[in-house]
């Protein structure tokens, strides 16, 4: 049984170090503690707290107010002791936010925490669990978008990006899906029907609607990354900075990012993973091109770490992956947001029927056993946090036509 810390101890021993870790220096210029939301003037940035002689048990106080560079509030943090459910502070924190909203006319984000779990309440009152609180730069961008956000379902789709009717319909479906408040979408389209173009058109629509500014495109093969970068971002957003993430390539100031799962999951010195170079609120939209089924992120750590709209692109998933993929993207009744299969595409004359030759190989028939691989390949497995002695994958994983 763990030690039951008081709220004060929880803040000092757990919450303060987490805030410091993501860039909020408690006791510093941009973090105000024990702020009275009624007596403070958020317009003139005069924050009234306990230090001015007000009794803690008489007036209500915001545990933490996080400030932007101009010292205006951009988020509040409601803390509870470790033994209390995080959600217990939600009603209280919404009251504090209303006090701020009366003065500033905006709904700033709320973070709820007991030190072990963090929840985020956005301006639409949607609560969801997040890995960590967001840093100042990301909160600034999120609030800026929030002030200008429009309904993505009303955005005009760019015909230069998608011109086929089924592609246009796919883009509309996803934009309408996000318009209804969903945060994940799964686009299931047969190979060769234009998934990447559909994804780029969705990105374009969300940017026009001020729902997204920073986008991460995740792939499991370098060739897919090159396709997204060259035929997508460079072609349709020529004036926007693009960053291809790798061991040498890292920036937090680009608009579009392309990365393999392998890069994001690679270990960094002295500790941590590459993706942890970014804050949890670093991206407004993440597109996973088949990468959500990658062996390199079997626990979906990347998916869980970032708080963003998320789109999965996939051809027909294999039967053993289908359930997990649909659950990951919160597909209602086990159906993807968009489905355009091979035979639909053949009937639309987008694809032509194939004639396949079946070629049998040892890999297809026997699969792969890590302990039978060469030392070089076993070492490659270890770099991806797989244990060669126990690693096995069936040959069906590699069946392609």
Pin down the residues of each PLM region:
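Conserved nucleotide-binding/hydrolysis micro-motifs of P-loop NTPases
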Residues: 82-84, 116-119, 222-224, 262-266, ...
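Amphipathic alpha-helical transducer elements in NTP-driven molecular machines
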Residues: 86-94, 258, 285, 293-296, ...
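ATP-dependent helicase/translocase motor core
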Residues: 1-76, 80-214, 219, 223, ...
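Interdomain helical connector at the RecA1-RecA2 junction of SF1/SF2 helicase-like NTPases
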Residues: 323-401
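Conserved motor-coupling elements within RecA-like helicase/translocase cores
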Residues: 245-257, 277
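Short beta-alpha junctions and helix-cap segments that line functional grooves
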Residues: 202, 229-231, 243-246, 271-274, ...
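SF2 helicase catalytic motif II
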Residues: 276-312
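Substrate-gripping "pore-loop 1 plus following alpha2 helix"
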Residues: 270-284, 293-295, 323-338
